[in-house]
Amino acid sequence: MSTFSATANGGSTIGYAQYGSSSWSTGSGNGACQGAYKGTTAAKSRVGVMVFNGAGAALKGKLIQQISLSITCSGAGSGSSGKVLTFHKANYQSLNTGVRGSAQVGDTLGTLTGKFYSNTVTHTLNVSTNAALFSAMKAYFEAGNSALVLYNGETSSSSGYSSNY
């Protein structure tokens, strides 16, 4: 069994924009995020994009048995209790900074619940752990795709964070 590893942490591989905006923040200093900060409308909810260079070609047509996601989280957001990340297919297989955040959001792949606050956490997806998300991501990557989108459509108060920021 072979292993493929890819990281999304560069200026052309990770970033976010508000759903209704084409102003992108890119690179590992910004990351990919979802939810809203001082965003009282759906257009201000963040869309995060992660591109795993080489994944499309390396995984197309392969039989994927497990996916491990190592996620580094900042201390931003509503706190250290459990949060839910919502993953989507990407409408572009690149970090297309010439479009609004909304243009990147494809069909929903599923959700992942964990302690995503000021830490690095690894979640393993397979047929017995996070099975629904694994099945959707497996099919998506086996079809030759290499980008994932984080988006949950949450809004927040004018002075705070949304629940799953």
Q: Model-found features: residue ranges?
A:
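Flexible, small-residue-rich N-terminal segments that precede or flank a structured functional core
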Residues: 1-56, 85, 89-93, 155-159
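Beta-strand-rich interaction/scaffold domains
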Residues: 73-146
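Short, surface-exposed loop/turn motifs at beta-strand boundaries within globular domains
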Residues: 43-47, 62-64, 143
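A mature extracytoplasmic/lumenal domain signature
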Residues: 56, 68, 73, 91, ...
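Proprotein-processing/basic-patch segments
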Residues: 4-6, 44, 135-165
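Surface-exposed acidic, glycine-flexible loop patches that form ligand/cofactor-binding
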Residues: 56-63, 136-142
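A short beta-strand element within beta-rich, extracytoplasmic domains
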Residues: 52, 62-76
